[in-house]
Amino acid sequence: QALVCGTDFHYASHNSGSIHTLKAQERIEIIAIDPLMEDQIEKISSSKIEKEIEAGRIEEANASLGYMYSIDGTIRHGFQRGSKILNIPTANLEPDSLFTLPAIGVYAGYMKLKNSYYPAMINIGFNPTFGNTHKSIEAHVLDFDQDLYGKKVSFLFVQKIRPEHKFDSIEALKTQLKQDIETTRQILAKKSIQDWSSVINLL
């Protein structure tokens, strides 16, 4: 048996334990891994990646992770405004567990269904134009017309497009969403799912 950990690993009350105290006990082999560095300056750590995600810096987070950050969950019924009012249907995700949520805003990304990946415009926020008080995670899956209710999917994030805004009218919102869809296409044309082919089978 062996324990693989970083050289700065600590445990126990007030972080009083370290790899040195573990090695002194001689109960298990300790394999210490030197930290990964970004540009030989900043250490790549889980807390650094979490901060990048929370700030909406998805490109930086993905570069540190080596794969696209994703949230897993089940598609549930929403208000159906996307299909009935905006004519831009969205799939509302109920996360399976606690995830670090990216900053409120609109993102280019993918929806994974089974072993297939579909381009998607993802929104995290409150839909302020409609006065929502509950934060939602929803995606408009491009050129997709299958029934997703009850399906297990993953939303994968590639790049933030813009912050969330409150629009003066439904028409103004629709116009912006159409622009967001086009921006999503442009981003994903440059950063396609094939670019992650070396790690995609690990997701």
Label each region the model flagged.
Residues 78-203:
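Phosphate/ribose-recognition catalytic cores of enzymes acting on nucleotide-derived substrates
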Residues 1-88, 168-172, 198:
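Classical nucleotidyltransferase
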